[in-house]
Every structure is written in structure tokens, then in C-alpha cells.
């Protein structure tokens, strides 16, 4: 039976890694598939945090050379590196402020399947709207983002605190609305994810460190590795995809998933 739980942890790790950076809400998928396979982890919230950490570390690994060059450039006085680093910080801070003020409300009130389903569907409609508009893409390179554009993306990320919205979806769409090309918005979303998700993961791990035991470490470790590997596969593929295609396919998928979660919540006792 314990081996079966490890397999479930492996599966959910892959689900997290595959969905974290697609604009389709990893939270919605974890709720749905966790219910379907009846996964129970003694680590609870920590399991989710650690597999999210696995996904974001995959991005750090893929962009490691850019990160190293950015750090070197920042401290050597390179104007472009400093501009981009400050842009990421500008986009990051709204989430810090809102997160600190609203974290308890979000987890106690908004974290429910119904909210997730509604957010999925509303988010899909916003994607359709943004893709239907011919916004002037003034920025094709993520490193050339302006401070104003960065702030708009940061505010969009705050909306993603509503479970089911999708952090990547909100920041990519927010970037496009602000004047970034689809590819530039996607790449900036990845860079913004690093401080955002690493910060959130660190906060949650410290807060819930007491639930980490030898009994759940295997499940957590397996989920972490699975999420890391799956995210490696997704990130590069997504950048190539958005260069050639719109986000409409993800919008349709969100609607289908939202309807499924609504039905499951109303008739099959689906819970977060």
C-alpha cells in the first residue's frame, strides 16, 4: 500500500511539473487528480510546496547561464542587466505585499473547488479576449521590458493568488496586455516565477516544517524529482509553442477542466 502511495506521489509530481508553467492552473489539476487517485500525504501542504519547488528549480536550471550572466552583469555595472533585475523586482513586490496581507484569507476562504473552477473559466474568457485584440507589441525581448510593463505584470500576478487563475497564465496575459510579445511575456513570466515561487515555498516550508517526517519524506522526494523532470520538458516546449501559436488552445482546455471540476464538486464531493 505504501508503494502505491509512492506511485501516486510520482504521478502528482509529474502533473505539477507539466502544468505549473502552462496557463492552465496547476492547482486545479492537483485538486482534481488528487481526488481521482485518492492520494493522502501526511505532509499535506508541504507535499504541494515541495513539488512546486521542484518545478521552479527546473526553470532555474534551464536558465542558469542567463541567471549567472545577469548576476555578473548586475555587479559589474552592466546597464541592461541592472535594468532587467530591477524590472523583475518591481514585478515581484506587489505579490509580496498582497501575499502577506491576504494569505490567510486566500487559504481559508478562496481555496475551494468551486472558486478554482470559476477562476479557470473566467481566465479562459480573458485569454480569448486578449488574443482577439491586436495589442501593439512594443517589446519582443524580455530583457527590454519597461518598469511600467513590469509593474503591470506584477499586478496581474497578484490576481493569480485566486486559486485556479494560474500564475503563468496571469503573467503571460498581463505581459501581452502591457505590450510584450507572447514569447517575451512567457520568458519574463519564467524569470518572475523564480523569486515568487522560491519565496513562497521557503515561507511555507518554514511554517510547516514540523510536519516533515521520515514517513512522508519518500513521497515528497519522489514528487519533487518528478516535478523537476516534467517541468524541464515543458518550459522549453512552451517557449517554442508560443512563438508559433496563440494561447486559445489553453483557454478551451481551461473551460473543459473548469466544467469538470464544477461537476465533480457538486455531484462527487470533490474537495480541495
UniProtKB/Swiss-Prot annotation:
Keywords: Antibiotic resistance, Cell inner membrane, Cell membrane, Cell shape, Cell wall biogenesis/degradation, Hydrolase, Membrane, Peptidoglycan synthesis, Transmembrane, Transmembrane helix. NCBIfam families: PRK00281.1-2, PRK00281.1-4, undec_PP_bacA. It catalyses: di-trans,octa-cis-undecaprenyl diphosphate + H2O = di-trans,octa-cis-undecaprenyl phosphate + phosphate + H(+). The keyword Repressor does not apply. It is an enzyme of class 3 (hydrolase). The gene is uppP. Catalyzes the dephosphorylation of undecaprenyl diphosphate (UPP). Confers resistance to bacitracin. Its EC number is 3.6.1.27. It comes from Acinetobacter baumannii (strain ATCC 17978 / DSM 105126 / CIP 53.77 / LMG 1025 / NCDC KC755 / 5377). Bacitracin is thought to be involved in the inhibition of peptidoglycan synthesis by sequestering undecaprenyl diphosphate, thereby reducing the pool of lipid carrier available. The chain crosses the membrane at residues 4-24, 43-63, 86-106, 109-129, 145-165, 186-206, 222-242, 249-269. One of its GO terms (biological process) is peptidoglycan biosynthetic process. It holds the Pfam family BacA. It is found in: Cell inner membrane. This is Undecaprenyl-diphosphatase. GO terms for cellular component: plasma membrane. Belongs to the UppP family. InterPro entries: UppP. It comes from the Bacteria. GO terms for molecular function: undecaprenyl-diphosphatase activity. It is a multi-pass membrane protein.
Amino acid at each position: 500500500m505504501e508503494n502505491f502511495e509512492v506511485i501516486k506521489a510520482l504521478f502528482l509530481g509529474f502533473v505539477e511539473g507539466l502544468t505549473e508553467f502552462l496557463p492552465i492552473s496547476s492547482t486545479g489539476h492537483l485538486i482534481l487528480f488528487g481526488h481521482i487517485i485518492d492520494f493522502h500525504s501526511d505532509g499535506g501542504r508541504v507535499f504541494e510546496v515541495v513539488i512546486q519547488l521542484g518545478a521552479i528549480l527546473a526553470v532555474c536550471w534551464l536558465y542558469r547561464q542567463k541567471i549567472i550572466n545577469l548576476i555578473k552583469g548586475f555587479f559589474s555595472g552592466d546597464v541592461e542587466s541592472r535594468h532587467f533585475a530591477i524590472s523583475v523586482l518591481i514585478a515581484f513586490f506587489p505579490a509580496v505585499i498582497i501575499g502577506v496581507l491576504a494569505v490567510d484569507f486566500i487559504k481559508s476562504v478562496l481555496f475551494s473547488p468551486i472558486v478554482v473552477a470559476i477562476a479557470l473559466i473566467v481566465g479562459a474568457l480573458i485569454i480569448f479576449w486578449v488574443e482577439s485584440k491586436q495589442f501593439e507589441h512594443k517589446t519582443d525581448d524580455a530583457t527590454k521590458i519597461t518598469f511600467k510593463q513590469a509593474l503591470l505584470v506584477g499586478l496581474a500576478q497578484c490576481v493569480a493568488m485566486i486559486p485556479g487563475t494560474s500564475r503563468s497564465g496571469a503573467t503571460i496575459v498581463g505581459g501581452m496586455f502591457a505590450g510584450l510579445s507572447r514569447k517575451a511575456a512567457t520568458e519574463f513570466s519564467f524569470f518572475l516565477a523564480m523569486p515568487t515561487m522560491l519565496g513562497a515555498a521557503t515561507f511555507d516550508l518554514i511554517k510547516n516544517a514540523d510536519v516533515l517526517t521520515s514517513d512522508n519524506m519518500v513521497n515528497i522526494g519522489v514528487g519533487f524529482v518528478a516535478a523537476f523532470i516534467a517541468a524541464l520538458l515543458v518550459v522549453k516546449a512552451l517557449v517554442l509553442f508560443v512563438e508559433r501559436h496563440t494561447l486559445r488552445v489553453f483557454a478551451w482546455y481551461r473551460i473543459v477542466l473548469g466544467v469538470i471540476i464544477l461537476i465533480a464538486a457538486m455531484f462527487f464531493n470533490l474537495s480541495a
